[in-house]
Amino acid sequence: MHLSPQEKDKLLIVTAALLAERRLNRGLRLNHPEAVAWLSFLVIEGARDGQSVAELMAEGSTWLRRDQVMDGVPELIPEVQIEAVFKDGTKLVTLHDPIR
């Protein structure tokens, strides 16, 4: 299997996001890398499912709450920027203050 650097990055995000999902399901609080991976994964999958950039940016602040992440993590993530493939091409999605 020959993967481009971008494809390797996406696989790493997916792997970390699946771990984050399992930890959330067990009631554990996410650390910084897990929270970023989870948010990034939801953007990538939302784009794949046909959601628009505007929809993802609006929903992005509802995916994680402060009580789902370790202390200090919300302050470490003032925004998340992720490139996602939409039906009309690759676009940059920015989530502002994604953990509220």
Curated annotation (Swiss-Prot):
It comes from the Bacteria. It is found in: Cytoplasm. One of its GO terms (molecular function) is nickel cation binding. One of its GO terms (cellular component) is cytoplasm. Its EC number is 3.5.1.5. It catalyses: urea + 2 H2O + H(+) = hydrogencarbonate + 2 NH4(+). Keywords: Cytoplasm, Hydrolase. Belongs to the urease gamma subunit family. Heterotrimer of UreA (gamma), UreB (beta) and UreC (alpha) subunits. Three heterotrimers associate to form the active enzyme. This is Urease subunit gamma. The lineage of its organism: Bacteria, Bacillati, Cyanobacteriota, Cyanophyceae, Synechococcales.
